């Protein structure tokens, strides 16, 4: 006994399972999205549904490296699952969108948000994580409204394992498809072509501690200095849609590259990565640029240790990673190198 994974072919050959999947289509992108309907269990970290008959669907509901789902198929997980599922809190008649438990903007935008566009219902209750920001909730409301979908209420998930009855969960789409959808659906048409510097002065990590040394250089080149923390997501879309050049320290807000026009120049000031587990972070924004035809440039900055780590990071990120990785430090930029970089 255990959790049984069904691939796409298995689903198609199992009439009972296949009837539990709806398929919605966005003609503009030739994209399909399967939506599981019925009863299922999941946790609010992985959003990996398991049916009451112990079936799972890795091909459809994985959004991380597939190796990160291996624990679902162990005897230990199955034993705990069988023991605890009768105590799981039950929700009814929901669409499970989910959001990042750490409220990571990159993950919310590139993994969760595009799935909204495939929701077929016109009146919904929507499940998201309680840690989602008001800014994200407002954006979700706006997207639903623009699609003619009435949001009756949000249902907030904590860090827990839940049972959902008579509910739906849309599949997770490839990053390539998500980027295409976000760019075509949300990008604004702006005639202005602006030069933008994104400050992280109010962020917890990767603040440029000698940023004041760089401001004169930006001002002499007519850059706008913008703190995205103060802007709604709709306003952030405006900023990136109108940008000719973007300079920024590494930030989840660079996920907004998906709203840029082809040919936009993106300059990323990066921490010095040292470990294999950082490879995804290292190439994250250069990959987005390659998908969109943007021109990508990067330079490294020196790490400056931070004394106080915020509670959200301590909760969701391994302590060794926090201590080792320069991703969780501030940045010191050598001015002469920086001037050569942006010139």
Question: What do the PLM-derived regions correspond to, one by one?
Answer:
Residues 1-343:
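The feature primarily captures lumenal catalytic ectodomains
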């Amino acid at each position: 006994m255990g959790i049984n994974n069904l691939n796409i072919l298995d689903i198609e050959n199992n009439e009972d399972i296949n009837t539990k999947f709806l398929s919605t289509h966005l003609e503009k992108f030739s994209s399909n999205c399967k939506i599981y309907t019925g009863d299922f269990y999941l946790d609010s970290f992985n959003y990996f549904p398991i049916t009451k008959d112990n079936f799972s669907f890795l091909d459809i509901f994985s959004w991380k490296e597939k190796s990160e789902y291996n624990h679902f198929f162990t005897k230990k997980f199955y034993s705990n699952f069988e023991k605890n599922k009768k105590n799981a809190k039950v929700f009814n008649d929901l669409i499970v969108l989910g959001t990042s438990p750490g409220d990571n903007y990159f993950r919310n935008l590139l993994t969760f948000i595009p799935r909204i566009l495939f929701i077929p219902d016109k009146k919904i209750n929507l499940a998201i994580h309680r840690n989602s920001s008001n800014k994200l909730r407002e954006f979700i409301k706006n997207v639903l409204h623009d699609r003619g979908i009435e949001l009756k209420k949000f249902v907030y998930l904590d860090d827990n394992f839940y049972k959902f009855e008579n509910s739906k969960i849309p599949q997770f789409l490839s990053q390539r498809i998500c980027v295409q959808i976000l760019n075509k659906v949300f990008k604004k048409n702006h005639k202005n072509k602006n030069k933008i510097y994104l400050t992280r002065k109010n962020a917890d990590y990767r603040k440029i501690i000698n940023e004041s040394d760089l401001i004169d250089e930006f001002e002499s080149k007519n850059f706008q200095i913008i703190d995205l923390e103060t802007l709604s997501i709709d306003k952030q879309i405006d900023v990136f849609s109108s940008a000719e050049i973007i300079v920024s320290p590494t930030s989840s807000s660079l996920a907004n590259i998906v709203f840029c026009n082809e040919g936009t120049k993106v300059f990323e000031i990066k921490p010095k990565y040292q470990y294999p587990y950082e490879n995804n972070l290292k190439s994250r924004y250069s990959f987005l640029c390659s998908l969109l035809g943007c021109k990508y440039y990067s330079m490294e900055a020196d790490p400056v240790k931070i004394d106080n780590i915020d509670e959200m990071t301590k909760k969701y990120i391994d302590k060794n990673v926090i201590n080792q990785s320069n991703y969780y430090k501030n940045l010191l930029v050598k001015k002469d190198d920086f001037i050569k970089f942006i010139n």
